[in-house]
Amino acid sequence: MFGIVGWVGFEHDIREKRALVEEMTATMRYRGPDDSGTYVDAHVGFGHRRLALIDLSGGRQPMSVPTPSGDVAIVYSGESYNFRELRAELAGLGHSFDTDSGTEVVLHGYLQWGAAVAERLNGMYAFAV
C-alpha cells in the first residue's frame, strides 16, 4: 500500500504550513519510492507517497478536479479490483477521465455517489477526500 497523510483544520490557513505537510509526506518515503506529491489549500493538506502499479505517468497524487464549489482533492492508497467497471459506469453518467488510474475513478465516484462510493469498491483501500 502507498502512504497517505492528511491535515484538515479551520483555525489556520494550511497553505502557510505547506512545508510541514511536505515533511509529513517525506516521513513515509519507505511506503512509496516512485513518486510523492502534496496538495495544500486553505483548510486541507494532503500528502502521498507512491509505489506505481497502474498508469505510471498519469496516476500522480494527490489528485484534484475543479467543481463549481471549488476543487475536490483525494489521496488514495489501495487496489480496487473493479475500477474499470466503475470507470465505464461513470463514463456512461457523463464523467470524463484524464488518466487510467484507479484514483481518478474513486474521485469521480465520490463526486457522483458521495461517501457511498466506498460501498461500490471491491478491494483493499484507504482514501481521504
Regions found by a protein language model. Give the residues of each.
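N-terminus-centric sequence/structural signature that marks the extreme N-terminus
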Residues: M1-V129
